[in-house]
Amino acid sequence: MLLDHLVLFVGDLATAITRFESKGFTVTPGGTNGPTHNALIVFSNDTYIELIALQSSRARLMMRSLRHVGVLALRRWLKRDLQTRLLDWMSGPQGLIDLCFRGTELNEIAHSSPLSGIGLTDPVQFKRHRPDGLVVQWTLRGANKRRQPFFIQDATPIDYRIPAGDVRIHPNGALGISEVRTGELIEPSVSNVRITHDPTLQPGSLSVTIVNEHDASDHIHGPEFFNTDIHLAPNPLDQQKT
């Protein structure tokens, strides 16, 4: 099991792209999916951060209203599916709101010991046609417990879905996500990133460390960055060499 990506919900995608580029990240335009559109910050270790926003500010207000009057809570009680998770994204606060694990067999994941008592939503297949004509296909399932991760399984090569090449080179030297601290105990474990339960964080909160090759440190946080909490840190392997 691997960490695939983190979801960062923002109020305005163009603003988010500009602000993260100002911090030295290369941001790659994504696409549209229903009422949302996205962009990606892709790293050399096959992890990425997805910046996602509603295309319409009116839709954002409508989603918040539905949440406020309890319609979404009622839907969540009546039906646990992937759509409920997406509605939570679109109606909730900005920031790092979810994490996705990558597996090769989601049916086996659903019956693994850490998740057998939680259960997964029914699988949903996705398909996207790239401008170069390639067809990208993948399947998503989510843990029934909202603050647990959702899962992706690729039906086509991973580099069809996650861009490769120069888009993974960042002026700030970012190499990849190395640690995610969570306000809730997350299961199952992954082998490519350290997932740490931090009881000082609010349930559902995420704090991310990204290692870089420039021996630099930075803390990206606050309202200007959509209440996210990202730490840019030196690569410990480089420090060991010195």
Regions found by a protein language model. Name each.
Residues M1-L3, L8-T28, F43-T242:
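Glyoxalase I/VOC metalloenzyme domain signal
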Residues T32, A39-F43:
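Short glycine-biased active-site loop of nucleotidyltransferases that positions the nucleotide triphosphate
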Residues G34-H37, Q202:
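Short acidic/glycine-enriched loop/turn segments that link adjacent beta-strands
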